Amino acid sequence: GLLDTIKGVAKTVAASMLDKLKCKISGC
């Protein structure tokens, strides 16, 4: 459903943001 799609997108965005933060903090 739509809610599941939104949840999936939110998880993907959160994961990519966390990866970027990790790169800034400790390098890629």
From Swiss-Prot:
GO biological process, one term: killing of cells of another organism
Keywords: Amphibian defense peptide, Antibiotic, Antimicrobial, Disulfide bond, Fungicide, Secreted
Tissue-wise expression: Expressed by the skin glands.
Superkingdom assignment: Eukaryota
Disulfide bonds: 23-28
Function: Antibacterial activity against Gram-positive bacterium S.aureus and Gram-negative bacterium E.coli. Has activity against C.albicans.
Family: Belongs to the frog skin active peptide (FSAP) family. Ranatuerin subfamily.
The protein's name: Ranatuerin-2B
